[in-house]
Amino acid sequence: MDRFLSNVTNRIDAKGRVSVPSPFRSVLARRDIQELYCLQDFAFPAISVGGPDLLERYERQIASMDAFSPEANAMSLLVHGGGVFMKLDQEGRLMVTDFVREFTGISTEVTFVGRADHFQLWQPNAFLAAQAEARAGRGFSAARPA
């Protein structure tokens, strides 16, 4: 399958690196994604991560707008000004840079969250809170049947 699914929390090592979960690395390999486009998410305190196709999708949306419109300018500010390219090291680790830490509040652990065509980097407690809020908004209870 070529989708990013599930969520996994991994610890950041002493050098500021975190291992990307194996299933996520497998999707990256199958899609032949060498360079990761990382974007400060528009709705959540998370970093959205995908291949160049993620950036291209946003750029197509911007190109469909009037280039001088406030909407196109705002979108470009978010997509280009809030994005960077990163690469995994040979062991499949990602450097948790200030770009990631300052936007998300991540300090010692990262929760990787699958979002189908991309994944996100979250501070673990922020992810749990957002997930609980999403469930509550859909009428789901956190309680499990006995």
UniProtKB/Swiss-Prot annotation:
- Primary site of residence: cytoplasm
Q: Which GO terms describe its molecular function?
A: DNA-binding transcription factor activity; transcription cis-regulatory region binding
Q: Name one GO cellular component term.
A: nucleoid
Source organism's superkingdom? Bacteria
The record, for Gene3D superfamilies, names: Transcriptional regulator MraZ domain
Any one GO biological process? negative regulation of DNA-templated transcription initiation
Looking up InterPro entries in the UniProt record yields:
MraZ (IPR003444), MraZ_C (IPR035644), MraZ_dom (IPR020603), MraZ_N (IPR035642), MraZ_sf (IPR038619), SpoVT-AbrB_dom (IPR007159), SpoVT-AbrB_sf (IPR037914)
Q: Where is the protein found, in the record's own terms?
A: Cytoplasm, Nucleoid
Report disulfide bridges, numbered on this chain: none
Q: Which HAMAP family match?
A: MraZ
- What does the record note on quaternary structure? Forms oligomers.
This protein's name: Transcriptional regulator MraZ
Per the UniProt record, the source organism is Agrobacterium fabrum (strain C58 / ATCC 33970)
